Amino acid sequence: MVKNNKIQKNKISNSCRMIMSTDPNNILMRHLKNLTDDEFKCIIHRSSDFLYLSDSDYTSITKETLVSEIVEEYPDDCNKILAIIFLVLDKDIDVDIKTKLKPKPAVRFAILDKMTEDIKLTDLVRHYFRYIEQDIPLGPLFKKIDSYRTRAINKYSKELGLATEYFNKYGHLMFYTLPIPYNRFFCRNSIGFLAVLSPTIGHVKAFYKFIEYVSIDDRRKFKKELMSK
C-alpha cells in the first residue's frame, strides 16, 4: 500500500513537472529571470512595438506580467515575438513552444454574453468604442460594458464637458488627464468615460487614450472581473 502511494505521488510529481516544462509562461520566464534591471528596461521598451503598454507600465510592469501579456497577445507566435524582442540586447535565443488555437476575434464574440479566457480585453474595448461611435447595435457582452458609459454620463457630466472643450480646442487628448480616481473601479470607469467621448473624438483616439491610461495589470484585473460575472 505504501509503495503504491509512493508510485502515485511520483506520477503526480512527474506530471506537474511536465506541465511546467511545456507551459509557455514558464518557458519564456526562463529567458527573462536572469536579466539585469537595465536589460529588462530595454526589453520593456522594445516590447512596446508589439504590446499595448500604458505610461505607467514602463516603470511598474513585472517580468511575469510581461510574459503573460506576450502569451495572451501572441498565443501562436509568443516564442518568435520574444526572440525578436531579445535582439535589442544582441541576444539570439531559441524558444521552442507548441502553439495553441488562436483567440476569437472580437467580431465573432459579439453575440456572446460572457467574457472568456481567449478573448483579449484590448480587442473588446477597441470594438466597443467603434460600435459606440458608429451606433452599431450591441450584443449581450457589450451591453454589460455599456452600463459603465451610462454611469459615466451621470457621474462625470461636468468633466465630460471639459474634456469635449479640450478636444475641440486642441484636436486631441494627448495631455489631458482623465478625472478618474484610482480605485478598484478605475478600469471600468475609464472605459465608460472614454465611451461617452468616442463619438466626439473617434474610437481610435478613445482606444489609444485607454491604452495610455490603464496599465496592463489593471486591464488583467478587470478581465478577471468580467469573466467572473
From Swiss-Prot:
Induction: Expressed in the early phase of the viral replicative cycle. Belongs to the orthopoxvirus OPG034 family. It comes from the Viruses. Keywords: Early protein. InterPro entries: Orthopox_C1, Poxvirus_Bcl-2-like. This is Protein OPG034. Transmembrane segments: none annotated. It comes from Vaccinia virus (strain Western Reserve).
